């Protein structure tokens, strides 16, 4: 299976990282060594098993190019490509609220670049927000080992600035000022719904 640029898909073994004891120590002492996606996956599993929320990662659409049929009852996919997602990474339901968000990581220490956010994703977030959904970006600064929830209502200001060719990124200070910090902890790894609770409270006042 290949990405749109033709490069083959390979599982990132660094996500699980080495021995099981090392992986367990990551759970106790923070997010170092694990991807944001894996952290969110752990949290979503905890929320589901605890009857707190039902939030899932949307599957990446795949375009099948070449299929072989060695037997009538068996099909073998020889070539396929990951297509660009048309919406955001995650959605679900929490206490009657529709939750929709995109998750991104950056190695930059001072800013989050906007060039890996797509127009159709922002359009989807806008539509979900207009229907009173709880919409946001979850951004991790890998080097700083900090994670923030940035509400769509704040993000759209920075996106407009980006589309107007004024600034191509959001500084970490702007995210700290306009977002909600999500600290690492033991269980769940990223209890981002605490930040969502604050967002719901703030937006309930703003949308009145």
Curated annotation (Swiss-Prot):
GO biological process: chromosome segregation; DNA recombination; DNA repair
Gene3D superfamilies linked: 3.40.1350.10
Positions of Mg(2+) binding: 87, 89, 102, 121
Protein localization: Cytoplasm
Catalyzed reactions per annotation: Endonucleolytic cleavage at a junction such as a reciprocal single-stranded crossover between two homologous DNA duplexes (Holliday junction)
Cofactor(s) the record lists: Mg(2+)
InterPro entries linked: Resolv_RecU, Restrct_endonuc-II-like, tRNA_endonuc-like_dom_sf
Keywords, in A-Z order: Cytoplasm, DNA damage, DNA recombination, DNA repair, Endonuclease, Hydrolase, Magnesium, Metal-binding, Nuclease
Documented EC number(s): 3.1.21.10
Keyword Magnesium in record: yes
Cell cycle listed as a keyword: no
Cofactor binding remark: Binds 1 Mg(2+) ion per subunit.
Site (Transition state stabilizer): 104
Gene Ontology CC terms: cytoplasm
Enzyme class: hydrolase
Gene Ontology terms for molecular function: endonuclease activity; magnesium ion binding; nucleic acid binding
Family the UniProt entry places it in: Belongs to the RecU family.
Function: Endonuclease that resolves Holliday junction intermediates in genetic recombination. Cleaves mobile four-strand junctions by introducing symmetrical nicks in paired strands. Promotes annealing of linear ssDNA with homologous dsDNA. Required for DNA repair, homologous recombination and chromosome segregation.
Name of this protein: Holliday junction resolvase RecU
């Amino acid at each position: 299976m290949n990405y749109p640029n033709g490069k083959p898909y390979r599982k990132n073994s660094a996500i699980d990282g080495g021995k099981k004891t090392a992986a367990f120590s990551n759970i106790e002492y923070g997010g170092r060594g694990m991807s944001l996606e894996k952290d969110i996956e752990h949290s979503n599993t905890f929320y589901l098993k605890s009857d707190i929320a039902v939030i899932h990662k949307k599957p990446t659409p795949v375009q099948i190019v070449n299929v072989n049929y060695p037997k009538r009852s068996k099909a073998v996919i020889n070539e396929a490509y990951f297509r660009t997602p048309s919406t955001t990474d995650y959605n679900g339901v929490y206490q009657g609220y529709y939750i929709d968000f995109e998750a991104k990581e950056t190695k930059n220490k001072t800013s989050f670049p906007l060039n890996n956010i797509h127009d159709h994703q922002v359009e989807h977030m806008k539509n979900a927000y207009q229907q009173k959904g709880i919409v946001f970006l979850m951004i991790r600064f890998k080097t700083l080992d900090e994670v923030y929830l940035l509400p769509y209502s704040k993000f759209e200001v920075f996106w407009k600035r980006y589309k107007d060719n004024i600034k191509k990124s959001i500084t970490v200070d702007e995210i700290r000022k306009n977002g909600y910090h999500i600290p690492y902890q033991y269980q769940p790894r990223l209890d981002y719904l605490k930040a969502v609770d604050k967002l719901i409270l703030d937006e309930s006042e703003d949308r009145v």
